[in-house]
């Protein structure tokens, strides 16, 4: 059974859902959702692909696996639901946005407005057990999300790929098309942000590139709720 995105990802990814690795992943997930507390909700797993059609992708921000606390994850890398405290890595992203582009620091971490502007907020693993980071690593999601990156790499319109931290930077090998722009640094996590994330200006660099190819720049300001 294929997931439905209701956009051009449906045709592009339909073959993945028939592959053995995905059928095994699906069996694993059915059991996990029955027996464990899993994030995000099964209805939110593919939100990044549902909100940002292939043809509209301007920017990819690659994350690792979803937040594993209650009510945080909702299918977008780095984003949390409204009313949930902004996690530390996202707080640091907002600090960098403030120094880079002067955006005020919002009272929430709900990044849906980025997704609607063509930012694919993609985690490399799309599900996780509550309280257990990386618990769904190596179960098949990486094959699926690598395929997403490969399809984006083939696109004839340039895309900005933002890769923060070792896990994301390891995907650089999939981005071989020279028309794309890669922006990379250490992760915005408090463990590494002072070692090269702060001051790296990824947001203005992204907009400068988009303007250079006659694309509308991103409005990075997340509004207060």
From Swiss-Prot:
GO terms for biological process: base-excision repair, AP site formation via deaminated base removal. Keywords: Cytoplasm, DNA damage, DNA repair, Hydrolase. Its EC number is 3.2.2.27. InterPro entries: UDG_fam1, Ura-DNA_Glyclase_AS, Uracil-DNA_glycosylase-like, Uracil-DNA_glycosylase-like_sf. Its main location: cytoplasm. It is found in: Cytoplasm. One of its GO terms (molecular function) is uracil DNA N-glycosylase activity. The active site is at 65 (proton acceptor). Pfam families: UDG. It catalyses: Hydrolyzes single-stranded DNA or mismatched double-stranded DNA and polynucleotides, releasing free uracil. CDD domains: UDG-F1-like. It comes from the Bacteria. PROSITE patterns: U_DNA_GLYCOSYLASE (PS00130). GO terms for cellular component: cytoplasm. PANTHER family: URACIL-DNA GLYCOSYLASE (PTHR11264:SF0). Excises uracil residues from the DNA which can arise as a result of misincorporation of dUMP residues by DNA polymerase or due to deamination of cytosine. Belongs to the uracil-DNA glycosylase (UDG) superfamily. UNG family. This is Uracil-DNA glycosylase. It comes from Clostridium perfringens (strain SM101 / Type A). The lineage of its organism: Bacteria, Bacillati, Bacillota, Clostridia, Eubacteriales.
């Amino acid at each position: 059974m294929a997931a439905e995105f209701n956009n051009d990802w449906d045709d592009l990814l339909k073959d993945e859902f028939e592959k053995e690795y995905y059928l095994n992943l699906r069996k694993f997930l059915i059991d996990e959702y029955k027996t464990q507390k899993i994030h995000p909700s099964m209805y939110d797993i593919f939100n990044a692909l549902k909100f940002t059609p292939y043809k509209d992708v301007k920017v990819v921000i690659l994350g690792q696996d979803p937040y594993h606390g209650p009510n945080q994850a909702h299918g977008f890398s780095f984003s949390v639901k409204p009313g949930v405290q902004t996690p530390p890595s996202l707080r640091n992203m907002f600090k960098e946005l403030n120094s880079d582009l002067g955006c005020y620091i919002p009272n929430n971490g709900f990044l849906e407005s980025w997704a609607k502007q063509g930012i694919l907020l993609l985690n490399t693993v799309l599900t996780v057990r509550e309280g257990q980071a990386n618990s769904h690593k190596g179960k098949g999601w990486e094959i699926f999300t690598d395929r997403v990156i490969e399809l984006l790499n083939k696109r004839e319109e340039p895309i900005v790929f933002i890769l923060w931290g070792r896990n994301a930077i390891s995907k650089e090998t999939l981005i071989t098309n020279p028309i794309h722009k890669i922006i990379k640094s250490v992760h915005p996590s408090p463990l590494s942000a002072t070692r090269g994330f702060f001051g790296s200006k990824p947001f203005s660099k992204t907009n400068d590139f988009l303007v250079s190819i006659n694309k509308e720049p991103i409005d990075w300001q997340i509004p207060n709720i």
